[in-house]
């Protein structure tokens, strides 16, 4: 399993500038994350930038005051670099080509992807080939900018902590009324759109109804909700089981689970040490057990 950060993407673009034509007139970003890659590229190359749909509807590429130092080309047919962050099956690439087809008489389009990770080869330039990580079902490349918004077949193989991931960490639950009021109205953080595999939370099972209601109200779909099997704080405390141990035990018993997403770094590290399986910490953006 390979984990790619935003810093990794910027580094890959910077280290591969020699692969990118420097005589293009502007850059088009394919929504959504392709715009992120295109923006970084436009900064490095000091080129005007526009997103795909704005270009289709007639808007002009822009780039701020720094572009006044850049000499524009006088060629009649402008060259545009069409950028996406990743290429796997090629759906977004094909849709972009279809949308841009009516403009081919006026523009020359060069298609570029930062990370080539799949079977589709219909691309002019790929900055980094990561297909060795995606050549079978057991391997995957995960990206910082969309790790919590994958499609269902990937998210279904993830286990999620709840507090600190889906919602802000609650106050000390020994103040029962304050804690109860908070988890009923917890402030949301990351809300996955696709159905996820399992939520593994150290919350007491006595709070199941409240937790299920909050998840439903915020559109979080899941296969399983696993909570600590105790009804009171004292009962859980007297068990001697730490949050990390509880989560690691569940993770170890799920052979199909490929990643645990945890909110707290010390717990993330402990879960990885106890299971030997990959763990991602959302608060520190650290990935344990990947490349």
Locate each region found by the language model.
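PRPP-associated nucleotide enzymes
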Residues: 1-162, 167-186, 209, 213, ...
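Acidic, Mg2+-coordinating phosphoryl-transfer loop and its flanking beta/alpha structural elements
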Residues: 112-114, 256-291
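Acidic, divalent-metal-coordinating active-site segment for phosphoryl/phosphodiester hydrolysis
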Residues: 87-94, 246, 251, 264-275
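Conserved Lys-Pro-Asp/Glu-containing loop-to-beta segment of HAD-superfamily phosphomonoesterases
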Residues: 79-84, 241-265
């Amino acid at each position: 399993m390979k984990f790619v950060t935003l810093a990794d993407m910027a580094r890959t673009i910077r280290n591969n500038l020699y692969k990118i034509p420097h005589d293009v007139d502007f850059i088009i970003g394919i929504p959504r994350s392709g715009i992120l890659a295109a923006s970084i590229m436009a900064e490095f190359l000091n080129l005007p930038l526009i997103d795909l749909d704005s270009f289709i509807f007639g808007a002009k590429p822009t780039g701020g005051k720094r572009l006044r130092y850049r000499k524009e080309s006088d060629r009649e047919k402008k060259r545009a670099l069409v950028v996406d962050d990743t290429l796997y099956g090629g759906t977004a690439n094909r849709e972009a080509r279809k949308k841009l087809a009516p403009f081919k008489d006026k523009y020359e389009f060069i298609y570029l992807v930062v990370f080539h990770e799949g079977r589709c080869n219909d691309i002019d330039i790929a900055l980094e080939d990561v297909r060795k990580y995606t050549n079978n079902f057991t391997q995957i490349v995960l990206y910082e900018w969309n790790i919590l918004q994958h499609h269902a077949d990937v998210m279904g193989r993830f286990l999620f902590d709840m507090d600190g991931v889906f919602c802000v960490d609650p106050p000390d639950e020994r103040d029962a009324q304050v804690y109860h009021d908070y988890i009923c109205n917890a402030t949301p953080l990351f809300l996955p759109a696709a159905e996820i595999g399992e939520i593994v939370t150290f919350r007491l099972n006595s709070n199941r109804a409240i937790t299920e209601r909050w998840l439903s109200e915020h559109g979080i779909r899941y296969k399983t909700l696993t909570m600590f099997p105790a009804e009171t704080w004292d009962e859980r405390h007297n068990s001697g089981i730490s949050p990390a141990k509880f989560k690691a035990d569940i993770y170890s018993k799920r052979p199909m689970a490929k990643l645990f997403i945890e909110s707290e770094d010390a717990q993330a590290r402990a879960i990885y040490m106890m299971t030997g399986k990959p763990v991602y910490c959302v608060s520190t953006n650290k990935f344990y057990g990947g490349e």
